[in-house]
């Protein structure tokens, strides 16, 4: 790796750590530079703004999620579970993503949150689309799902994007009222999307699993706890 690329990766690593520790909005470019003992000129050589740096992080997280998904797929031979693994890997509200999700959630319902949601959706869809197309084709060949319409993989990923965003906003609405997560409402919403995906694919009843209920309960509780801490302080 070239020296310039190393410095860029170092900036990304430090920024991600600070964003997760202090929050994105509470972290300034200068905070990042102070850790790196770098100049503003050095920062702006690599990134046009803090927002541009965050966009790069979103693509990095998506690429990392895909790597983890491919590792999981290497150990799974059954077609429907493979599709489930891709859907699970696509979702940012997984146990492994709790730190990053807790950093993003407070911004989602703000005016700038729409741009953030669109940026993350674009990063995830672009990254996961080839593997989703591949796995859907294999499942179709195995007659696990019915022949999907053209561009159905992208439609499915857009649906999953709306799923995690709606879950996050519902969780956030409870936090703003200083309430613990409404487990029943969250599970109802997750089940609504699960059934929609199942119908979209014409998959066997009960075969689609976006994320296990146990893990989602755990993640929702953890995200709620982290988001409530600043309000209690």
Question: How would you describe each model-predicted region?
Answer:
Residues 10, 18-57:
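Helix-turn-helix
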Residues 7-15, 32, 57-61, 65, ...:
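Generic hydrophobic, amphipathic alpha-helix propensity
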Residues 56, 67-102, 149-156, 190:
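Hydrophobic alpha-helical connector segments
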């Amino acid at each position: 790796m070239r020296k310039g690329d190393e410095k860029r990766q170092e900036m990304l690593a430090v920024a991600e750590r600070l964003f997760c520790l202090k929050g994105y909005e509470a972290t300034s470019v200068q905070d990042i530079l102070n850790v790196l003992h770098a100049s503003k000129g050095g920062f702006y050589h690599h990134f046009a703004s803090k927002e541009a740096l965050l966009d790069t992080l979103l693509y990095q997280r998506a690429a990392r999620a895909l790597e983890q998904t491919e590792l999981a797929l290497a150990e799974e031979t059954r077609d429907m579970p493979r599709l489930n693994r891709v859907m699970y890997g696509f979702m940012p509200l997984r146990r492994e993503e709790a730190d990053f999700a807790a950093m993003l959630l407070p911004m989602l319902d703000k005016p700038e949150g729409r741009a953030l949601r669109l940026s993350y959706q674009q990063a995830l869809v672009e990254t996961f689309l080839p593997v989703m197309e591949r796995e859907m084709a294999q499942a179709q060949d195995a007659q696990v799902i019915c022949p999907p319409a053209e561009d159905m993989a992208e439609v499915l990923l857009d649906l999953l994007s709306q799923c995690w965003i709606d879950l996050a906003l519902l969780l956030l609405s409870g936090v703003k009222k200083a309430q613990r997560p409404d487990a029943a409402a969250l599970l109802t919403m997750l089940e609504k999307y699960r059934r929609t995906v199942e119908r979209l694919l014409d998959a066997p009843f009960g075969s689609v699993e976006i994320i296990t209920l146990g893990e989602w309960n755990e993640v929702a509780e953890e995200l709620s706890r982290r988001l409530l801490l600043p309000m209690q302080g």
